[in-house]
Amino acid sequence: MNPSRIRIKMCGMTRSEDIQYAIDLGVDAIGLIFYPKSVRNVSLEKARIIVNNIPPFVDIVAVLVNPEQSFVQLIINEIPVQLLQFHGEESSEFCRQFNKPFIKAIHPKTAIQIQSAVDEFFDASAILLDTPSDKERGGTGLTFDWNIIPENLSKPYILAGGLNESNILEAITMCHPYAVDVCSGIEASPGVKDHLKMSRFIKAIWG
C-alpha cells in the first residue's frame, strides 16, 4: 500500500484548537474518548462544544470501553459521530445493535488472537490493533510486536500503540495497515496535543 493513502485518526482529543489543527493537517478522523477512567475522557457537554465546527469528510469516532447500551445510544443522539470504537470486552452482538459503523479494538499477543477477532467481528468496519496492557485501554505509548500481524487479513485493520513521528514510517512500511491511530505520540501531556508533533507525524507519512 502506498503510504500516501494511509488514513489517519488522531485520538484522545479534548480541546477545540487541537481538533482544528488536526483538520488543517488533513486527518481523516478524530477520536473522542467517553470513558471516565481515562485521563483523556470527555463529557457529553464538552464533546458537543469541541466538535461544533467539524467540516464534512472528517469522521468523529466515539471511543468506548464496556459501555452501557443506554450510554452509547445517548452519545449517538447527542453527538454527530460517524463511527463507534469499542475498546473493551464487548461482544459482536453488542457492537452491531446500534446500526452504526463500528471499529473493534483488540490487544493481541498472538496472530491467532487477531484472526479470531476478524472472524468474530465479521461485520465491523475495521479491527484496531493496540498494545496489550494490564493498566491502560490505549494511549500507553508502547508498541507491540508487529510481526504477529497475519498477512492478507480479510478485514481492514488500523494500527495503533506507541506510534510517533520516529517509528510511523517503519510501521506502515512493515505492516501495510489501512489506517493508523495516534494518541500519546502527538501529545504534550495527556489530552493536550503538541502541534509540532502532530505536523511532524503527518509529514513522516505524507511527506
UniProtKB/Swiss-Prot annotation:
InterPro entries xref list: Aldolase_TIM, PRAI_dom, RibuloseP-bd_barrel, TrpF_fam
Cross-referenced Pfam families: PRAI
Catalytic activity: N-(5-phospho-beta-D-ribosyl)anthranilate = 1-(2-carboxyphenylamino)-1-deoxy-D-ribulose 5-phosphate
SUPFAM superfamilies linked to this entry: Ribulose-phoshate binding barrel (SSF51366)
EC code: 5.3.1.24
GO biological process entries: L-tryptophan biosynthetic process
UniProt entry tagged with the keyword Nucleotidyltransferase: no
UniProt pathway annotation: Amino-acid biosynthesis; L-tryptophan biosynthesis; L-tryptophan from chorismate: step 3/5
Coiled coil: none
GO MF, any single term: phosphoribosylanthranilate isomerase activity
Keywords: Amino-acid biosynthesis, Aromatic amino acid biosynthesis, Isomerase, Tryptophan biosynthesis
Alphabetized HAMAP family for the sequence: PRAI
NCBIfam families recorded: PRK01222.1-4
Family indicated by similarity: Belongs to the TrpF family.
Name of this chain's protein: N-(5'-phosphoribosyl)anthranilate isomerase
Gene it is expressed from: trpF
